Design a protein with these regions (language model features):
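Short, hinge-like loop/turn segments at secondary-structure boundaries
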Residues: 50-55, 179-181, 204-209
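Cytoplasmic membrane-interface segments at the C-terminal ends of transmembrane helices
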Residues: 27-30, 60, 90, 144, ...
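C-terminal boundary of histidine-terminating zinc-finger modules
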Residues: 57, 198-219
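Conserved GTPase G-domain substructure that encodes guanine base recognition and part of the catalytic core
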Residues: 217-227
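Conserved beta-strand scaffold positions in the cores of enzyme catalytic domains, especially
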Residues: 2, 34-36, 84, 186-189
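Walker A/P-loop phosphate-binding motif and the immediately C-terminal alpha-helix
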Residues: 2-40, 113
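P-loop/Walker-type NTP enzyme "switch/lid" segment
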Residues: 32-114, 196-201
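Conserved catalytic-core segment of NTP-binding enzymes
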Residues: 107-199
Length: 227
């Protein structure tokens, strides 16, 4: 299965969602480790591990003949169940941008790998090309029930297959309002639980994933993989 996680703006929780999905899918899989492709460079911080030191997606894109299998091989093992591929040259201060053709090639590679294992791409606020979304099994837009976030999300929501809603207290809008605004179903709703932020701050998500984070996403993954 190939999932892309993205958002209309930074700071809404996309990397946390992608990291939790990767761990959950990897632990449940009998087909080898899950892969997270980390375009924003924040997945290691969420998992509490070192940054990948080898080549990443940027180097893979820079080689026109590189295969999908070679993309998988540059992943850094985080656990027996999870590998992380960094952005590589894309993460440099003046790093390369991904062209529409690059997005499509990258998407085809992820779709190929997703036939045998689980691939999660953390695109953050980097807006993938339409062809990339179309190649994914699930395109999950991370959003909050906040006017500013929803306003930015509306023009982009047509690319999403569903919404992961981070539910913050104090907002008057609920799940139904978000679905009506974006025209897509809310597939998982994550609470703003202090246990989640504390685990991230302490670098313990990889060792002890908070139930408040895993439980809502596990319901989605069990349906998505048909288990």
């Amino acid at each position: 299965m190939f999932i892309v996680c993205w958002s209309a703006k930074g700071g809404v929780g996309t990397t946390t969602v992608a990291s939790a999905l990767g761990m959950s899918l990897g632990q449940a899989s009998l087909d080898g480790p899950a892969i997270i492709v980390d375009l924003g460079g924040d997945v290691p911080a969420v998992l509490g591990v070192s940054d990948p030191s080898g080549p990443g997606l940027g180097e893979w894109l820079g080689s026109p003949t590189a295969s999908a299998d070679s993309l998988a091989r540059i992943g850094t093992p985080v656990t027996d169940d999870l590998h992380v591929i960094g952005a590589g040259a894309l993460g440099a201060p003046s790093g390369q941008q991904i062209s529409d053709d690059g997005w499509e090639r990258f998407g085809r590679a992820c779709a190929h790998l997703g036939e045998e294992r689980h691939v999660v791409v953390d695109a953050g606020p980097m807006m993938p090309a339409a062809a990339f979304h179309a190649l994914a099994d699930h395109s999950l837009l991370t959003a909050r029930a906040c006017y500013v976030v929803l306003r930015r999300s509306i023009p982009m929501a047509l690319h999403a297959t569903g919404i992961v809603l981070v539910a913050e207290p104090g907002h008057s809008m609920g799940t139904t309002d978000v679905e009506r605004s974006l025209g897509r179903p809310v597939l998982a709703e994550l609470p703003c639980d202090p246990a989640i932020s504390q685990a991230i701050d302490a670098g313990l998500v990889n060792a002890r994933v908070p139930h408040a984070l895993v439980r809502p996403l596990r319901r989605f993954t069990s349906v998505a993989v048909g288990r």
